[in-house]
Amino acid sequence: KNVIVAFKDNASIIEGEYCVDILLNNFTNQFIPVNDKFNFSYKAETHNFPTGICPFPGAETGVGGRIRDTLSCGKGGDIIAGTAGYCVGDILHDLYQINQYNDYYNNLIHNKPLTILIEASNGASDYGNKIGEPIIQGFCRSYRGDFIDCNNDKNTNIRIEYLKPIMFSGGIGKILNKNNYKKNLNYGDLL
């Protein structure tokens, strides 16, 4: 009922409220108070493979792409705050130097889980801070489960783990009600 834009454009838009905000007047280059209706936008995406290979810039560009989409929603929105989440494999082998895991993790093309958590968190925060969007909350999951498959005679060990990391980036923004939708362009229109 309150959804204005969903599953099209670069981000979703939901119904907001009238409020006073300070906006830049593009003609005078001065900030002016504006009493208008502002709606909320939300965008989320993952940047898993780049973050697994090179955590700091992988997470940085994940946040950057999501911020770009928030800014380009409709005829242009503003960013407010972000969230970041990480799901990685077992971090105990790094923390306690458990040798039985080292050969396995050294053969992966991804970084070790603890390295991903630290460097990806730094990268996501770095990009948001540089552009003026704080990451105000997030989540972290580290999981490895070892089970015995009792469905066969061999009682095979089964391991369940995040071998490929998940890097989640989400953010809220605001957009003027009159900017919810892009205009249709014709050939020769000036942008």
Predicted regions and their residues:
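Glycine/proline-enriched, intrinsically flexible loops and inter-domain linkers
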Residues: K1-L191
